[in-house]
Amino acid sequence: VGPYFDRFLTRWPTVETLAAAPLDAVLHAWQGLGYYARARHLHACAQAVVARHAGRFPASEAELRALPGIGDYTAAAIAAIAFDLPAAAVDGNVERVMARLFAVTAPLPEAKPELRRLAATLVPAARAGDYAQAAMDLGATLCTPKKPRCVLCPWRENCRGRALGFAEELPHRRAAAERPLRRGVAFWAVRPDGAVLLRRRPEKGLLGGMMEVPSTDWRAAPWPVAEALA
């Protein structure tokens, strides 16, 4: 991923250059970097920062959350790491650390607000950015989902989950609902010159704005050929 991202940053090194770029060019350059929705949000966010904040990211979590594509975690991470403000950046790694440290047995996702609250109680007034990155690294390297390396953890003496003997079981998760099966029919239409018929998906929703082959709607019942072609 690194070389792809380096090329992306070389092409658009500033918020202003990214904001001025055509969306299609940004999406094309995002190939190999993950979900295209992230590129769309990044582009929209750059445009909002230029239009609303003269090209400079705001420092407050509230203003950051008002930008496209930025939620609680990203807003807190920017506030802490970029501006060294005391904000609790809670990703999946930090959720796991907090659940074990405080022995929170309520399942996810219901436990998320409580885990964020507990995480906020530990954020120092100084060097908040260093702490945010250290907490995430702790979850990624020591307080791992399986076989946590508790003997090396700097919080091992204060960990309630470890003291109670069930740290590795945490956090609990609510059983996932069974995924429904949906069926559809896709159409492959090719001109004599080899061009393939494509259409653009709606801007909102799954894979918004991406190109696809035409298809029917998706439903539980099978599609008879005659009905699909109607």
Task: Describe each model-derived feature in a short phrase.
Residues D137-A230:
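Intrinsically disordered, low-complexity, charged terminal extensions of DNA damage-control enzymes
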